Design a protein with these regions (language model features):
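C-terminal motif of bacterial Sec signal peptides marking the signal peptidase cleavage site
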Residues: 15-19
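Extracytoplasmic small-molecule ligand-binding "clamshell" domains
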Residues: 30-36, 41, 47-49, 59-61, ...
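Extracytoplasmic/secreted envelope proteins and their assembly/folding machinery
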Residues: 56-59, 72-80, 94-97, 101, ...
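Extended ligand-binding regions for polar small-molecule ligands
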Residues: 23, 73, 135-177, 219-222, ...
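Positively charged n-region of N-terminal signal peptides that target proteins for export
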Residues: 1-11
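Periplasmic-binding protein-like
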Residues: 116-153, 181-183, 187, 200, ...
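Hydrophobic/proline-rich hinge and linker segments of small-molecule sensing/allosteric domains
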Residues: 44-58, 139-143, 194-197, 270-285
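A ligand-binding cleft/hinge motif common to bilobed small-molecule-binding domains
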Residues: 77-81, 101-133, 240-241, 256-267
Length: 285
């Protein structure tokens, strides 16, 4: 599921952002725990709207509230365990934040770094000072993949030679003039191409800059592939489709601020952790 200053993105909320599914923007994803709450029952909608005007001060205040999440993320899992909470699942964080602004949910559980971007781009929402939880990010690969050991070797080297620090300086630490990772001149790719599955609406980990997918995971994956002699191809898809894409062979690995969970380990293997993330909470001011 994804994480110190935010990337300056023009119109983060307008990243409208091409969806792979057919769910309209701001409409809960199919299978939402309470999909009818915002669209079917006027009474439920009125209740959510009323609740969303309350200022939520802490994680404890989420009890009994309507919470927006991105489908398939660890935030989705955490929200299900909040006492008395109604969980609204969305295909993109953008849609969950829009629902918050419209009063359809009371709060959004989101990874810290993307949450900061939404916070800074919207005057009517704020991130709670209290962290919801802390977690580690890793890259997902098919069960038993020979790439896992190779990726771990590359990750260790990239951390040791300062490449990871350079990427974080560019996207998170706000170091002026930081270039991140740049492919060394003369790099060759004798081993073919690897396809990375991601959900490119998760700044600063992955997002669109024009037609190009950029961000921490994109540069980190490029550094790994360069180290191992592979070209990198990035495929954008719904977050919940990443693991199925890996299992089906459509993608060789997945990187999208993914947290290692017992449920995910049933279907994929994970590399060593490359970054620590925080789950945070967005609410209306």
């Amino acid at each position: 599921m994804k994480k110190l200053i935010s990337v300056a993105l023009a119109g983060v909320m307008a990243l409208g952002l091409a969806a792979c599914g057919s769910t309209p923007a701001s409409e809960p994803a199919s299978g939402s725990t309470a999909a009818s709450a915002a669209y079917g029952s006027s009474a439920a909608s009125a209740s959510a709207s009323t609740e969303s005007k309350q200022y939520i001060f802490s994680v404890d205040d989420l009890t009994g509230k309507t919470i927006g999440v991105q489908l398939g993320t660890t935030g989705d899992t955490y929200a299900q365990d909040i006492e008395g909470a109604t969980v609204e699942q969305y295909n993109k964080f953008n849609d969950a934040v829009l629902a918050l602004k419209q009063g359809k949910v009371d709060a959004v559980i989101i990874d810290n770094e993307p949450g900061k971007v939404f916070d800074e781009q919207n005057d009517d929402i704020i991130m709670l000072d209290e962290d919801f939880t802390v977690e580690d990010y890793a890259i997902a690969l098919n069960k038993g993949s020979e790439l896992t050991e190779k990726f771990n070797e590359a990750i260790a080297a990239i951390k040791e030679n300062g490449t990871m620090d350079a990427i974080l300086d560019k996207y998170i630490n706000g170091v002026e003039g930081a270039e991140g990772y740049v492919t060394p001149e003369g790099t060759e790719y004798p081993n073919g191409t690897l396809t990375m599955a991601t959900n490119a609406y998760f700044p600063p980990y992955e997002y669109y800059e024009g037609d190009e997918i950029v961000g921490i995971d994109a540069e980190f994956a490029k550094a790994i592939c360069d180290y191992l002699g592979y070209e990198l191809k990035i495929e954008d898809m719904e977050f919940a489709s990443i693991i199925p894409a890996i299992n089906s062979g459509k993608a060789d690995f997945g990187a999208a601020g993914m947290t290692v969970t017992e449920e995910r380990l049933l279907n994929v293997d994970f590399t060593d952790s490359y970054c620590t993330g925080i789950q945070s909470v967005l609410v209306l001011k």
